[in-house]
Amino acid sequence: MRMTAHITHKIRIYPNQTQEAWLRKACGAARFVYNWALTDWAKQYEEFKQEHTKPKPSRVGLANQLNKLKISDPSLKWLTETSDQPAQNALQDLDAAFKRFFKGQASYPSLKKAKAKRSFRQYIRSKIFINGKLKLASLKSPIKMAEQWRFAPDAKFLFLTVSEQNNKWYAAITAEIPDCALPKGLDSETV
């Protein structure tokens, strides 16, 4: 039996100094937006509980607030120096965290610490490999990789997560691989 599978391939990347500065800024933007949104969400929710005429907090509302804030507050200009995706995905992550919390599946979301693992996620909308290097949206030059993508060449790339661990950078690329053969003895119901 054949089916579609999702697979993630984690590859070590070697950014130059300019690229590393951009990656650090993107990680910082994701963490800043997540923490800002968590604080604002809590404030808006308290206002909503006390006065039901106030709107309930939402990801879309916070995204609109963030866009206005980036324009009106000069100290947040640095958020526009990377792709918008890390910030938007941080809002999606917070939205998912609150949904799990309200369903009783997780504890209340907590602030992300600066010393914790740095990472951000981007959806892949265009070609990401150029001459054996990784091309990120909004980054001018591609990043050198330790190895090539080793799975199906016809894979549909979905998103990638860039992370830093112990001063080493990694890109975890998630793709959809069509028409995969299941191991013998398994069927789509078992998987």
Identify the residue ranges that each predicted region occupies.
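Nucleic-acid substrate recognition interfaces
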Residues: 1-191
